[in-house]
Amino acid sequence: MPIKIPADLPAYSVLSDEGVMVMSPDQAARQDIRPIKIGLLNLMPKKIQTENQFARLIGATPLQIEFSLIRMTEHQTKNTAAAHMEEFYRPFQEVRDEKFDGLIITGAPIEHLPFEDVTYWQELCEVFEWTQTNVHSTFGVCWGGMAMINYFHGVRKHMLDHKAFGCFRHQNLQPTSPYLRGFSDDFVIPVSRWTEMSQSEIDAAPGLTTLLGSADVGPCLVEDKAHRALYIFNHFEYDSDTLKQEYDRDVASGTEINVPINYYPDDDPSQRPLNRWRSHAHLLYGNWVSEIYQTTPYDVERIGLDTTDLRA
């Protein structure tokens, strides 16, 4: 939560420059409280696992969150019971007239396909356009983030020679970003992908700022202020055993796979993996929800119309 201090107090500008969340009494007086409405467009095969992962992170804040599960309209999932989808999910076409404070677009295990060859690509492009009028802040994750940054900026995804798989060290490139409050300078994030985005292409796209990056696996978290979006290519939301499940699955099927880097103690798969990213995962998603709370209109119907920043 923000600290409320007079705008003319020297600490106000000092803390603001350091990225600390501060709010003047006048700003606080203009800010009412209501539930934050966040949607999850779930493109992953294991729907329930993914729901739990993201709900755990955004539900850990002191704010009340209204969490809505959304699916692509025509795409039929094969890995989750139809009864579950019918009871808890709504198709995009059913929610497109609603407004959301936040939207998370998950990854999908289809990174080997060109974006245009994905069966639901046309509707997903409709979602991207819809976020500009109906969503205050959008968070694209892994393939979902790559798809968004490609759609809005033409940044391409590139196939890797070998799967980036494991827990890789990352660096905090923008310590004063409100999304990185409390972040260490150096930390690990789970990575599991066959594709990457080029830092040079991101740098060449107007309006993009890389917040987190890795010398080993490239850019990780990118801010797109013009489209009120964040794009993350790695997996802070992963459970402690998610990489283990992926590794065990591939070993059992005979698929060639390396032991995930820097995940098991001594890189020994017989040992229990250590979770060394959980605290930063909560920081990132908590900061995202907090930033939504600070900047979204009180009247949900003003989302996409009201560009006033309550901190201005």
Swiss-Prot record:
CDD domains: GATase1_HTS. Transmembrane segments: none annotated. The record marks E111 as: Important for acyl-CoA specificity. InterPro entries: Class_I_gatase-like (IPR029062), HST_MetA (IPR005697), MetA_family (IPR033752). Gene3D superfamilies: 3.40.50.880. The keyword Amino-acid biosynthesis applies. Pathway: Amino-acid biosynthesis; L-methionine biosynthesis via de novo pathway; O-acetyl-L-homoserine from L-homoserine: step 1/1. The active site is at C142, H235, E237. Substrate binds at K163, S192, R249. GO terms for cellular component: cytoplasm. Its main location: cytoplasm. Pfam families: HTS. It catalyses: L-homoserine + acetyl-CoA = O-acetyl-L-homoserine + CoA. The keyword Acyltransferase applies. It is an enzyme of class 2 (transferase). Its EC number is 2.3.1.31. GO terms for molecular function: homoserine O-acetyltransferase activity; homoserine O-succinyltransferase activity. Keywords: Acyltransferase, Amino-acid biosynthesis, Cytoplasm, Methionine biosynthesis, Transferase. One of its GO terms (biological process) is L-methionine biosynthetic process from homoserine via O-succinyl-L-homoserine and cystathionine. It is found in: Cytoplasm. Transfers an acetyl group from acetyl-CoA to L-homoserine, forming acetyl-L-homoserine. HAMAP family: MetA_acyltransf. Belongs to the MetA family. PANTHER family: HOMOSERINE O-SUCCINYLTRANSFERASE. This is Homoserine O-acetyltransferase. It comes from Ruegeria sp. (strain TM1040). The lineage of its organism: Bacteria, Pseudomonadati, Pseudomonadota, Alphaproteobacteria, Rhodobacterales. The gene is metAA.
